[in-house]
Regions:
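Core subunits and conserved enzymes of cellular information-processing
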Residues: 2-242
Length: 242
């Protein structure tokens, strides 16, 4: 999985996929524990979870995540006006991520959160874990979770900078979260959408970009298994031609 290539270590794209899911899920747990506001990307799912779980105990945060990702995947296909079988693997990733998130939520329940300073530490760690996870997913050919896939595919389709596009996407998600909070919990009641959400929306794209720069400076991402053609057929065909 690791090696050396031109003064940089090589890093498996498959391992980047695993780390991406784990880091992002743990970052969300820390974010929920900090209680300064969830990230804009997960705000809609979190609000639905908080709204529905008191009435239906089987509803989990992870479940709402992959249900909403299915809707986002459909919206992406309509926007790009194309469908690939590899996109279905993004939904599989969303389901895997949902189960990992629910498992980590059980672990996170044991973390103390009595002081505001400890919660602040959780918030800072959360931002770094989530950014590291999202950036890792951007460096793997395995279909990322639908949220990352949407940012990656739509920004490429329209020729937009991926980090700036993500910041814009996050801001829109933040506004949707605020609207959902008002509808579900009452006007001017900010449930799950707080100052931490706004701060995250403004700087998350930048932090992810810094992690990407760090990764690319120290590692060369390479495939250890011949599976790229099943997930990125266009890239595989181009590589073969070269």
């Amino acid at each position: 999985m690791f090696g050396r290539s031109k003064m940089k270590r090589t890093f498996s794209t498959g391992l980047a996929y695993v780390f991406g899911i784990a880091f992002a899920a743990w970052g969300v747990v820390l974010m929920e524990k900090a209680d300064f506001g969830v990230s804009m990307a997960v705000a809609p799912a979190y609000l639905l979870y908080r709204w529905l779980s008191p009435a239906w105990s089987f509803v989990t945060f992870g479940m709402e995540e992959y249900c909403l990702r299915a809707v986002l995947l459909l919206a992406m296909c309509l926007l790009l006006w194309r469908f690939r079988v590899s996109y279905l693997f993004s939904f599989v990733t969303a389901v895997v991520y949902g189960f990992v998130l629910d498992a980590f939520m059980l672990l996170g329940a044991m973390l103390p959160a009595r002081s505001v300073w400890l919660r602040a530490i959780y918030y800072v760690l959360r931002m770094h874990f989530c950014a590291a996870g999202v950036s890792a997913m951007f460096h793997t050919y395995i279909s990322p979770e639908v949220y990352e896939l949407f940012v990656k595919e739509v920004s490429a389709h329209f020729g937009a900078d991926i980090n700036r596009f993500k910041t814009g996407y996050d801001c829109v998600s933040c506004l949707i979260g605020v609207a959902m909070s008002f509808l579900a919990f009452g006007l001017w009641h900010f449930e799950g959408v707080k100052w931490g959400t706004i701060l995250c929306a403004l700087i998350n794209g930048y932090v992810i970009g810094r992690f990407s720069t760090f990764y690319e400076k120290h590692w060369t991402f390479c495939d250890r298994f011949p599976w790229r053609k099943y997930f990125a057929p266009d890239a595989a065909a181009q590589t073969s031609a070269e």
